[in-house]
């Protein structure tokens, strides 16, 4: 709320926080129903990407209301491509798993303790400009090249 005060042209609706079950279809329905009832909404900040996990879940024209969401999973990338979402805040999911296994192997096999108490994983802002590059990560992480050979 403090950050919002820096942008006087942006207003939060009086009932501007909308909750939903963490079920993609229900989340998309809440978002669509709310947008239809409040056409003045110019943007959405999604803490969870649930509404974007459904194919064709957003039923308004691209650009009508901007969308920024957490995660940049394969299902969500289509919303960047279509112009419905402007930014996805990507977490390094693959790195989390890779680094965790690496630390465990080093401890169990080499008896090496981690050198850092906390390991920060950088976030990546995925937009139309870097969508193709980010999408390649999923092909690599999900071994699509190996499967498609």
Walk through the language-model features, giving the residues of each:
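Beta-strand segments within the central parallel beta-sheet cores of soluble alpha/beta enzyme folds
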Residues: 14-15, 67, 117-120
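Hydrophobic alpha-helical segments within soluble ligand-binding/sensing domains
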Residues: 1-2, 24-28, 72-76, 91-112
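Hinge/cleft segment of the Venus flytrap/periplasmic-binding protein
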Residues: 95-149
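Residues at the C-termini of beta-strands that transition into short coil/loop
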Residues: 16, 71, 92, 123, ...
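Hydrophobic alpha-helical
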Residues: 16-79
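Sec-exported extracytoplasmic/periplasmic mature domains
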Residues: 5-9, 32-39, 81, 105-109
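Short beta-strand elements at the ligand-binding edges of bilobed clamshell
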Residues: 82-94
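A generic structural signal for alpha->beta connector loops
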Residues: 9-12, 64, 84-85, 122
């Amino acid at each position: 709320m403090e950050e919002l005060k820096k942008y006087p042209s942006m207003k939060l609706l009086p009932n501007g926080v909308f909750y939903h079950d963490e079920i993609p279809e229900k989340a998309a329905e809440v978002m669509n129903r709310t947008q239809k009832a409040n056409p003045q909404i110019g943007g959405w900040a999604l803490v969870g990407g649930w509404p974007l996990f459904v194919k064709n879940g957003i039923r308004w024209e691209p650009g009508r209301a901007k969308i920024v969401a957490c995660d940049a999973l394969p299902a969500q990338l289509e919303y960047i491509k279509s112009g419905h979402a402007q930014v996805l805040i990507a977490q390094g999911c693959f790195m989390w798993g890779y680094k965790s296994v690496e630390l465990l192997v080093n401890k169990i096999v080499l008896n090496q303790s981690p050198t850092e108490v906390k390991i920060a994983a950088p976030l990546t802002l995925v937009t139309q400009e870097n969508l193709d590059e980010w999408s390649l990560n999923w092909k690599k992480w999900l071994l699509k090249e190996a499967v498609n050979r």
